[in-house]
């Protein structure tokens, strides 16, 4: 479902580090933990997967990132948002909700899903992740 191929990225004009020649495949249904020291590229990799790079963080990018068959650099942000979300390390920095159900529904609400479609999807997701 997620494929990162020969990706190298360096941020423009920030002096921030870069990642070099990253290759990673993540199968549908997998749970992956990115860990490492500060500045090693964890956040950069998540920004590549969720489309923030190249749309909101400029820099030099080579290689390819595909999510659900979509090449991230060639896909409109709204289509990426239908497939990708982020969960932050600190729960207090999560979006705007205080409960799990609302967090799960957040993306669907922003895409204007009807309630009768959202509720079963929230229940299905909670069951899939054993909550």
Walk through the language-model features, giving the residues of each.
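A short, flexible loop at the N-terminus of ABC-type nucleotide-binding domains that lies
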Residues: 1-4, 9-22, 53-58, 74-76, ...
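Short, conserved post-Walker A segment of ABC-type ATPase nucleotide-binding domains
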Residues: 32, 43-56
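The feature captures the beta-strand-to-loop junction immediately N-terminal to the Walker
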Residues: 35-38
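Short helical segment in ABC ATPase nucleotide-binding domains corresponding to the A-loop/adjacent helical element
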Residues: 50, 85, 92, 98-109, ...
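Conserved ABC ATPase "signature" region
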Residues: 69, 116-131
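ABC ATPase NBD coupling module
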Residues: 70-85, 110
């Amino acid at each position: 479902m997620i494929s990162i191929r020969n990706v190298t990225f360096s941020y423009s004009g920030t002096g921030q580090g870069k990642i070099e020649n990253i290759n990673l495949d993540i199968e549908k249904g997998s749970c992956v933990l990115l860990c490492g020291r500060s500045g090693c590229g964890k956040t950069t990799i998540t920004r590549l997967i969720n489309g923030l790079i190249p749309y909101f963080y400029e820099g030099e990018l080579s290689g390819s990132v595909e999510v659900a068959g979509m090449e991230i650099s060639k896909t409109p942000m709204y289509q990426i948002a239908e497939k990708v979300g982020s969960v932050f390390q600190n729960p207090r920095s999560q979006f705007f909700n205080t409960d799990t159900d609302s967090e799960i529904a957040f993306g669907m609400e922003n895409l204007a899903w009807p309630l009768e479609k959202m509720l079963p999807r929230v229940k299905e997701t909670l069951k899939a992740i054993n909550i």
